[in-house]
A protein has these predicted regions:
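Short glycine-rich anion-binding loops that position phosphate/pyrophosphate groups of nucleotides
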Residues: 79-81, 103-105, 135
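NTP-dependent small-molecule kinase module
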Residues: 19, 23, 117-156
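Hydrophobic positions on the alpha1 helix immediately C-terminal to the Walker A/P-loop
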Residues: 16
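Hydrophobic anchor at the beta1->P-loop junction of P-loop NTPases
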Residues: 5
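ATP-dependent small-molecule kinase phosphotransfer cores
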Residues: 30-92, 121
Length: 156
């Protein structure tokens, strides 16, 4: 039995996959972890350097391989895995797809809770705090470079 979990980022796919796999028992696989192992870097780094198209190509290949590798797994897909029709088709044909649907309010609350937990930790270790509200990439880079120039060398 293959079970494939889909849903928005933050809806709990990875956590639920591990819990379901323990109960059945099946193997739990996190597609994003498989992708990062294959790439040798974070998804964000790869995405930034190579673009969304290249990332989606890798994601498509991983989904194809993982969904045929074992007849007994629970797969947590990445939040954007369903963007390609071939991924939706393969998931539907190769197992039972479960959509973990979380409301925008639930997702926002989870993100807010995570923010509340981590913001003090980020601040504790930061030399500078740069507010990203309303700023595009070039503006953020400019702000960072200005801050570094004003501050001079920062001790390691």
């Amino acid at each position: 039995m293959n079970i494939f979990l889909v849903g928005m980022p933050g809806c709990g796919k990875s956590t639920v996959a591990r819990a379901v796999a323990r109960r059945l028992p099946l193997t739990s696989v996190d597609a994003d972890q498989v992708i990062e192992q294959r790439l040798g870097c974070s998804i964000r780094s790869y995405f930034d350097e190579h673009g969304e198209g290249a990332f989606r190509d890798v994601e498509e290949a991983v989904i194809d391989e993982v969904t045929t590798a074992s007849p007994a797994l629970v797969l947590a897909t990445g939040g954007g895995a369903v963007l390609r029709p071939i991924n939706r088709q393969r998931l539907r044909e190769r197992g039972t797809v479960i959509y973990l649907r979380a409301s925008p309010e639930q997702l926002a609350k989870r993100l807010r809770d995570l923010y509340d937990e981590r913001d003090p930790l980020y601040r504790e270790c930061a030399h500078f705090v740069i507010d990203t509200r309303g700023a595009g990439l070039s503006a953020l880079v400019h702000r960072i470079l200005m801050q570094l120039e004003l501050a001079g060398p920062v001790a390691d």
